[in-house]
Amino acid sequence: MAGGPPNTKAEMEMSLAEELNHGRQGENQEHLVIAEMMELGSRSRGASQKKQKLEQKAAGSASAKRVWNMTATRPKKMGSQLPKPRMLRESGHGDAHLQEYAGNFQGIRFHYDRNPGTDAVAQTSLEEFNVLEMEVMRRQLYAVNRRLRALEEQGATWRHRETLIIAVLVSASIANLWLWMNQ
């Protein structure tokens, strides 16, 4: 789990904070939204203490020597395929077994881990990360929609002002023409 989604979540929070700091200084609402999202993330981390304890137990036991290989040693030319997590097998460990595939790939063996706790912790932290990411995207979409609505209202206001100015100029021109013709 070291180097997994919590690091990505922290990076995302930092990039959002930096983005807001480089943006307009008058956008206090966005600062509040980001602060609220960071607080929500810390609360979700605090609420998952039970999951963290499971993770610490897994790290302290003999099965902790197995690590997730999230960045597999594959060349980057493979395209947009996501790396598949693999478990390293500890020699002489009783809960990992080998299963032979009887087909075209005779002799190839697949390693499986029978420790569901590790998978459950990884799955729940990914779900928390996805929920947090969706919440951030929803807030950003709301902010973009609010800005767009404000710009549309501003454009409508300018059109009304332009129409009013043109009407005043046309009336003044007609009045000047009438006065000129009467002299």
UniProtKB/Swiss-Prot annotation:
Transmembrane segments: 163-181
Entry keyword set: Apoptosis, Endoplasmic reticulum, Membrane, Mitochondrion, Mitochondrion outer membrane, Transmembrane, Transmembrane helix
Origin: domain of life: Eukaryota
Membrane topology: Single-pass membrane protein
Listed result of changing A10V: 16% of the population; infertile and fertile individuals
One of the GO biological process terms: apoptotic process
Location (main, coarse): mitochondrion
GO MF term set: identical protein binding; ubiquitin protein ligase binding
Family matches, as Pfam families: Miff
Region entry Disordered, spans: 42-66
Tissue: Testis-specific in fetus (aged from 6 to 11 weeks). In adult, expressed predominantly in testis, with some expression in lung, heart, kidney, adrenal gland and whole brain. Highly expressed in certain types of cancer tissues such as hepatocellular carcinoma, colon and gastric cancer. Weakly expressed in normal pancreas.
Cellular compartments annotated: Mitochondrion; Mitochondrion outer membrane; Endoplasmic reticulum membrane
GO annotation, cellular component aspect: endoplasmic reticulum; endoplasmic reticulum membrane; mitochondria-associated endoplasmic reticulum membrane contact site; mitochondrial outer membrane
Subunit structure: Interacts with BIK and RNF183. Interacts with IMMT/MIC60and EMD.
Function, in words: Involved in the regulation of endoplasmic reticulum (ER)-mitochondria coupling. Negatively regulates the ER-mitochondria distance and Ca(2+) transfer from ER to mitochondria possibly implicating it in the regulation of apoptosis. May collaborate with RNF183 to restrain BIK protein levels thus regulating apoptotic signaling.
Stated name of the protein: Fetal and adult testis-expressed transcript protein
Organism: Homo sapiens (Human)
Encoding gene, per UniProt annotation: FATE1
